UniProtKB/Swiss-Prot annotation:
GO terms for biological process: negative regulation of translation; translation. The keyword Ribonucleoprotein applies. This protein is one of the early assembly proteins of the 50S ribosomal subunit, although it is not seen to bind rRNA by itself. It is important during the early stages of 50S assembly. This is Large ribosomal subunit protein uL13. It comes from Pseudomonas savastanoi pv. phaseolicola (strain 1448A / Race 6) (Pseudomonas syringae pv. phaseolicola (strain 1448A / Race 6)). CDD domains: Ribosomal_L13. Part of the 50S ribosomal subunit. Keywords: Ribonucleoprotein, Ribosomal protein. GO terms for molecular function: mRNA binding; structural constituent of ribosome. It holds the Pfam family Ribosomal_L13. GO terms for cellular component: cytosolic large ribosomal subunit.
Length: 142
């Protein structure tokens, strides 16, 4: 018996919607990253993108534990000398709530072209409304 290897053209991808309201950031992000990679499927193959599409709603209602609201800092750099910028969780969730979940999940995916393809299947929205109703996403609870 030969080992099964998934082919990119035969992969079946489903759409799922996840409600982030009241969820813990890290625990939700690990589940989403695992689903984006396709590790929950029996036909998972490391070098093929077998993951599903994930739509996250209510990103503005995500929570973190402890004092991370003020202590967790996100850094970005322009590439120029002295071009480092920082913003804490509290300000980022008020400014761009989608980026909090996107950053957490992106850090859990592979840092290569395949990981970038997986990341493109993640859709995050601050409120409860999303434009992907035509795909008929199934509700996913963690």
């Amino acid at each position: 018996m030969k080992t099964f290897t998934a082919k990119p053209e035969t992969v079946k991808r489903d759409w799922f919607v996840v409600d982030a309201a009241g969820q813990t950031l890290g625990r939700l992000a690990t589940e989403i990253a695992s689903r984006l990679r396709g590790k929950h499927k029996p036909e998972y193959t490391p070098h093929v993108d077998t993951g599903d599409y994930i739509v996250v709603i209510n990103a503005e209602q995500i929570r973190v534990t402890g004092a991370k609201t003020t202590d967790k800092i996100y850094y970005s750099h322009s590439g120029f000398p002295g071009g480092i910028k920082s913003i804490n969780f509290e300000k980022l969730i008020a400014k761009a709530p989608e980026r909090v979940i996107e950053t957490a999940v992106k850090g859990m995916l592979p840092k290569n072209p395949l990981g970038r393809d997986m990341y493109r299947k993640l859709k995050v929205y601050a409120g409860a409304v999303h434009p992907h109703t035509a795909q008929q996403p199934q509700e996913l609870k963690f």
